Every structure is written in structure tokens, then in C-alpha cells.
Amino acid sequence: MAKRDFYEVLGVERGASEADLKKAYRRLAMKYHPDRNPGDKEAEDKFKEANEAYEVLSDASKRAAYDQYGHAGVDPNMGGGAGAGFGGASFSDIFGDVFSDFFGGGGGRGGARGGAQRGADLRYTLDLDLEEAVRGTTVTIRVPTLVGCKTCNGSGAKPGTTPVTCTTCGGIGQVRMQQGFFSVQQTCPRCHGTGKMISDPCGSCHGQGRVEEQKTLSVKVPAGVDTGDRIRLTGEGEAGSMGGPAGDLYVVVNVREHPIFQRDGKHLYCEVPISFADAALGGELEVPTLDGRVKLKIPESTQTGKLFRLRGKGVAPVRGGGAGDLMCKVVVETPVNLDKRQRELLEEFRKSLQSDTSHSPKASGWFEGMKRFFDDL
């Protein structure tokens, strides 16, 4: 079964902060921890899945590799380092950590103040020809996104005015709510955590601080990419709000079908039609490769479906390593539209085979097997 996206496992956006990741992980860990679900295999699997996702995303280097290459970037078999164990997280550790936050402990772990929010990450599907994917290329794309409003410089306020302090939270961005015996701190519902209110909004962005725009970008595609590979353009996602950083743009590669070649990782496959005569007598023919035509020697008595390997004529992987091979599968074509002379020759040839089955070992074996089958009935 294919692994789920780690961000999806934790239920967070790709631009999630470390605090958001930890909060999401603790929530899942408390729910599915084996100490709370003894003997529940499904809960144990979900706990392992959450643990593996958090192990990768909480590590800056592993997260960067995952964002760039997906699961392959952190696969131990490909040089990555993600594991899938329990990671040593006990239920008491997780449980205590949550209550520390709930009662206001942890030295200010209640989240960012001031309302600054990171912009959303964007996804763009880039269609490439096989030749472009194999050799690499540079393409220009246009991406609809949100950019900072130039009229108000992203503040959302009309030029010449400034936001005023929120009267609900007094500019703190947080309010305290009484829930039974506990006093819980929450984001201010009026200013949404900014601590400011815009009394006279900007006419260009209507107080949002961002406007829609088509952004033109140049994307350098490395040689060897394949369908599903992602190219991360840092800071090219949506602009942040209230001074927050921009998100990232993920360019997802989609390689179009090729009229001749099929790709499987670093190897290429193609079918090569050959004549009945060439299959029987042998010969030499030209076959296409991504580097041009090459000669392929066909030995006599070649059967349809035989594979010929052209070493090094495949694809050099984007993450390094030697190029793959081109696998040519020969397909023997039955001649059609025969003239009178050709039919006479084939009739004569067929008669010559009827008295000698050594020329058709597979057919001879099949008929012998069929005869034994009916004899045994």
C-alpha cells in the first residue's frame, strides 16, 4: 500500500510551523497510543504512521528532502533516514505536555502573536515531453496567486491611515474565556489575533492586504525528472498576511505519453516490428533511441516478444547514478496484401514444413500435448 502524504497524516498544511506540527502530532499520539488502545492493531498502525510523519517533518533537513522529493527523499533505501517505530514517545510524556500547554505552561508556547500568517503553498502541474524530462529544460509558467497589495504595502489600511488598536483584546490578539473551572486563552474573534482593526480599508485590496495576480516564473527542470517529482520554489507561493512570510510553490511534473517509448524508472521500453523473413533468417535494422538511431542485430530464428537490451540508452536518474537501458521488444509482423507470386512462394514454403516439424518446436510440442490430452480422455 502506498504511503500517505505526511502532511495529510498529521492533518496540517505544508507551511505548518513547528508548533502546529507538534500540536497535531500530540493530538494523534494521545488518540492512538498503544497504552490507551491495548490490542488494537489499527490504532497501533495509525500511531506508527503519525510517529513516522512527525519524525520526518520535525527535522529540518528531513523535511526539506521530503518537500523536494516526496517519500523517496527520506527512504532509508535511497539514502533517507525516516523510521516507522514508536520513537520512544510514552503516553505520560505526551499527556503531560498537553496539560502543560492547557494550563498556560511551557514558557509562551501559545502561538505567534501579532497576527502575521504565512502564505499558503501552491501547486502547479507542469506537463513535459519525455525528451524534456530526460534532458532537462527551462520553462516559463504563469501562476495565479495572491501578492502583497502595493497600494497599502500589505497593511490593508487606506494610504495615509493606520490600523487602530482592537478594543476587544486591547491589542494583545488573545482573549481569555472561562470554561468551567478553567480559564482558557484563545485568539481574539474580532481582530483574529492581529491586535489591530482597520477602520478605513484600502480600496485596492478591500482591507485584505493582498490582491490576485498572475505571476510569471522561470522554472529550471533538472535532467531525469519523472511523473510525480516536485520542484520547490521557496517563497513563490501566496504572499503572507500582516507581514507574514510567503508560502512556497510546488511544481509537480507530469510526463506526457510518448508515441514510441514507455518509461519505467530509469529504463525505457519500445516495440520494434520486424518482418517474418528477418525473424527467420536474421538481419540488422535501425531502432530509435533518445540519442538518435542505432543498429540492432537480429539473430536468426528470433521469436516475437524477444527482448533486446541496449545498455545505457535509458534515463540518467535525477538523483544521480548511471543511465538505465532501452529494452526493445520485437514483434514479428504477419505479411498482408500479398500478390500472386508471394502467395505461391508461401504455399510452397508451408508444404515444405508439413513433413518436418523441427522448424516449429513450439507448435510441435503443443500438438503433441493436445494429442496426449485427447488420448487420455
UniProtKB/Swiss-Prot annotation:
Domain J: 5-70
Cofactor binding note of this UniProt entry: Binds 2 Zn(2+) ions per monomer.
GO CC terms: cytoplasm
Binding site for Zn(2+) 1: 149, 152, 202, 205
Name of the protein: Chaperone protein DnaJ
HAMAP family linked to this entry: DnaJ
Molecular function GO terms recorded: ATP binding; heat shock protein binding; unfolded protein binding; zinc ion binding
Pfam families: DnaJ (PF00226), DnaJ_C (PF01556), DnaJ_CXXCXGXG (PF00684)
Key words of the record: Chaperone, Cytoplasm, DNA replication, Metal-binding, Repeat, Stress response, Zinc, Zinc-finger
The organism's taxonomic lineage, starting at the top: Bacteria, Pseudomonadati, Pseudomonadota, Gammaproteobacteria, Pseudomonadales
Binding site for Zn(2+) 2: 166, 169, 188, 191
SUPFAM superfamilies assigned to the protein according to its UniProt record, in alphabetical order: Chaperone J-domain (SSF46565), DnaJ/Hsp40 cysteine-rich domain (SSF57938), HSP40/DnaJ peptide-binding domain (SSF49493)
